[in-house]
């Protein structure tokens, strides 16, 4: 009769077959226990993230580190690889940009993401995370290869899969039967059936007798909170058409305390597009409601609170403002529309979501014009360049689009962003705008202040000081982050989205 060992799990104590362990595993376990207490000290204010570490220590089976390759070091690849290393895996991040790889090796971060830099430096120092341009070597060493390369949109909204195809071909060239079984994982956001095409490329170009499965494992990280999202996910979606691949992928995610959604390859590919499109729909819906509120004299924030308390709806993403932007939502909505069109099932609903989003910035500009009449030579300060707070990413940023439009109409524009000054300068090259290094200097002599990104420091700004620096006391809050009564008390006219305008006593 086999001896039994017990272990803790979210379902309580359960018994597992006892098997002899390598004594070195005990050392690994003790090291992880020590690392956990260090993590708790670092993250005293983040109980959820600490609980991830706890579940990692008392997981149902003793953790075995795996060798993982991440192809691509953008937001998704770099953050995913770093978090895998943080929980104990051995990770090689691969990129064909030699300069970028050298910078990463030397501790230079190509992106801003809270907590990421410290995590990268500590795992590189510990030997758990490395960077290389040698894809073949990574494929030789690693059991599982994640593809996290860009999937930019074409003009018609379809997804450009040329990077996926090229990387798949390179992986196929590097695979050898003697390396053993390998799993290739699509981590990039891809259209349904991409996994099948990757499999075809592998079969076409790989050596005979190579054993490979292709898996879809979409990411759901949010820029600005990507580390927390990856360390404490709502769910982990794994799409595989083989049980062997599914079992190994579950081992990869063993340290994470989250439900695993086990589905087929095509369903996993569709989940990401469907999820992001639904979130974009919620944003456009509340912005459409905001337009009604402005005409009816209602407050969209109160309306959102009232409907968001319904558990079937939730308050998340019911934030009226300038609309959605960034590298995901615009691309994924267009991609899903294109996928549906190609399959002969047009998504008219999502086309309206796009139109509402495009109209939102026009509605906002109309209100500024209504107040200021002609914008030429008007001094307008813009707080925010990044597409959202806690990131330096300006891809598809509504703030960037707004700055461009104001400059095109002849306004004298100054702009400030705490993290996106450099990326913003590149995105706004050729645009007549002055990017400032201080949020208060940005508003000096301005006739209008526009809040375009929801940075916390804007919400807590000293409005009395801002009023003293500005030429005229007019605020257009495109993110509804300022307290209107405080703005009025400081002497401002306050205009927001989906709420009535407020004026100081005259």
Where are these regions (language model features)?
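Intrinsically disordered, low-complexity segments enriched in serine/proline and basic residues
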Residues: 7-9, 21, 32
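Polybasic, lysine-rich low-complexity intrinsically disordered segments
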Residues: 2, 22, 42-48
